Amino acid sequence: MARIAGINIPPHQHTEIGLTAIYGIGRTRARKICEACGIAYSKKVKELTDADLEKIRDQIAQFTIEGDLRRETTMNIKRLMDIGCYRGFRHRRGLPMRGQRTRTNARTRKGPRKGAAALKK
């Protein structure tokens, strides 16, 4: 089993799909990494040699991924909340921040409905 950036890459998947198991790497970035390393996207992860894996690790080291990316995202949201801007306010309240309506819909962001009895109290 290939281990890249502290993540076990599923061996039965194609390289392009397997790399998406790493947080911060999607299909497009995975494809570009494969191109830069000279590896076919359709090659299975278990078929990769140690040299191929090392090339992939070197390419991935150039990007912000996993814990660093999660930390950066969290800090960006925290900064928005600290400066008191509209987006930070919406994050704090758990509401959509990109102008969507909230009178109806927005259930994903607001959570499950509260019954009429809960609202009267």
UniProtKB/Swiss-Prot annotation:
PANTHER family for this protein: 30S RIBOSOMAL PROTEIN S13/40S RIBOSOMAL PROTEIN S18 (PTHR10871), SMALL RIBOSOMAL SUBUNIT PROTEIN US13M (PTHR10871:SF1)
This protein's name: Small ribosomal subunit protein uS13
GO BP term, example: translation
Function summary: Located at the top of the head of the 30S subunit, it contacts several helices of the 16S rRNA. In the 70S ribosome it contacts the 23S rRNA (bridge B1a) and protein L5 of the 50S subunit (bridge B1b), connecting the 2 subunits; these bridges are implicated in subunit movement. Contacts the tRNAs in the A and P-sites.
SUPFAM superfamilies, alphabetized: S13-like H2TH domain
Superkingdom of the organism of origin: Bacteria
Species classification: Bacteria, Pseudomonadati, Pseudomonadota, Betaproteobacteria, Burkholderiales
Gene Ontology cellular component annotations, sorted alphabetically: cytosol; small ribosomal subunit
Record's subunit section: Part of the 30S ribosomal subunit. Forms a loose heterodimer with protein S19. Forms two bridges to the 50S subunit in the 70S ribosome.
